[in-house]
Every structure is written in C-alpha cells, then in structure tokens.
C-alpha cells in the first residue's frame, strides 16, 4: 500500500507525475517511503533488502528521504551492486548527508529555510488578525539536485 501521511503522499505524487510525463513505466513498488519520518537509514536498509530480493534486476529507486536513500545504498554495496553503474538512487530533502555520502546522493531539494520563513509569516499574520484566518495551502517549488548516485554512464 502507499503512504498514509500527507508529506510522503505529496512526494510520491510528484514522483508519479514526473514518471507519467516521461517515457518510463510507473512501478510504485520502486518507491521507498517512511510513514514515521523518523527512522531513516535502518528502515531504508530493511525495505531495500526486500526490494532488491523481489527485483534483482532493478536499476533505479526513489526514496522519500535522503536517509532512506543512504540505507538503500548501504544494502546495495553489501550485495555488490554498484551505484550508479547498476542501480541509480534519488532521495528527497537535500540534507547534508546527501552531499557527504559516497557516492553523493541525487536528491530533490526541499527549501527548509524558505518553508520556515513562510510558516512564520503565516503564523504572524494569524496572530495579528482581527478576524478568523482561513486555512491556506502554500506550495513551495523544489528542484532536483543531480549527484553521483544517479549519474548516467
């Protein structure tokens, strides 16, 4: 089954949209997500072992966090699967670990500073409002940061 929390759901929907707009076929089994958003690398390792066993010829995976991606790469290395030559990996968030990991992890940049600024602005406007403020959805653009883990040979 797919993700149940809104953060993972939106990340997966973005991935699905990108795949549907490309020449590739969508296989949602190839998405590693974390419902709790706290256990990272360890959960990535557990899910990756199952995924690589089910799909031994797998050549690419999207993980909904960079920490899940690190777990996937760790498992791939233990199974002598070369990243990115045999398996391409992309994470989400652009945490510092994605730049420092070997190989560096391609990721979708989540602009945390901009998100915090927008949240603070919304909070201050709600605090200073004289009437009830309605719920507001704010969409902040992300971008893909290509690194070594998805490098095309």
Residue ranges of predicted features:
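Bacterial carbohydrate/catabolite-sensing allosteric modules
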Residues: 1-153
């Amino acid at each position: 089954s797919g993700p149940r929390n809104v953060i993972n759901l939106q990340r997966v929907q973005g991935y699905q949209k990108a795949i549907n707009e490309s020449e590739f076929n969508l296989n949602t089994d190839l998405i590693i997500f974390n419902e709790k958003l706290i256990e990272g690398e360890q959960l990535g390792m557990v899910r990756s072992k199952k995924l690589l066993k089910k799909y031994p010829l797998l050549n690419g995976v999207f993980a909904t966090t960079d920490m899940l991606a690190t777990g996937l790469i760790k498992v791939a290395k233990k199974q002598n699967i070369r990243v990115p030559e045999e398996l391409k990996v992309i994470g989400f968030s652009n945490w510092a670990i994605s730049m420092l990991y070997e190989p560096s992890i391609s990721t979708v940049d989540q602009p945390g500073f901009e998100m915090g600024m927008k949240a603070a602005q919304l909070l201050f406007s709600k605090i200073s409002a004289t009437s009830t403020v309605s719920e507001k959805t704010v969409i902040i653009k992300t971008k893909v940061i290509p690194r070594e883990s998805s490098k095309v040979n």
